[in-house]
A protein has these predicted regions:
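C-terminal motif of bacterial Sec signal peptides marking the signal peptidase cleavage site
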Residues: 6-9
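Exposed beta-sheet edge and beta->alpha loop/turn motif
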Residues: 70-113
């Protein structure tokens, strides 16, 4: 049984909320904020990821959460998301569906992919 929590009560209260916030930050071009929803803590790795976003000019056009599965112990989750994005390789949006793995870190869901 899954309990549904009000989204207004707590930021990133569910894995889907974290993924939604991540993609909204990407849509806004706020790559640093997007990376704050991941479990990357190494500053060098964060800088590498930021450069990748900027170099390839990755822009999320649209996204949709398709499903969410939380492990029995409540420490891991998988969120399936369909997104369309453009990059420096193509201005035509490319659609893809991906399963993002999440882990709970200090009570917050973080993308671990």
């Amino acid at each position: 049984m899954v309990a549904v929590l009000g989204m207004a009560s707590c930021k990133s209260s569910s894995p889907s909320d974290t993924v939604t916030a991540y993609f909204k930050a990407l849509q806004a071009g706020d790559y640093e904020k997007a990376l704050s929803y991941t479990d990357i803590s190494d500053q060098e790795e964060i800088q590498k990821q930021l450069e990748k976003f900027k170099t390839f000019d990755i822009k999320v056009v649209d996204f949709e959460i398709l499903s969410e599965k939380i492990s029995d112990d409540g420490k891991n989750a998988v969120v399936e998301v369909k997104s369309s994005q453009t990059s420096s390789f193509s201005s035509k949006p490319e659609e893809n569906t991906k399963e993002l793995k999440l882990v709970k870190v200090d009570g917050k869901w973080k993308i671990h992919d």
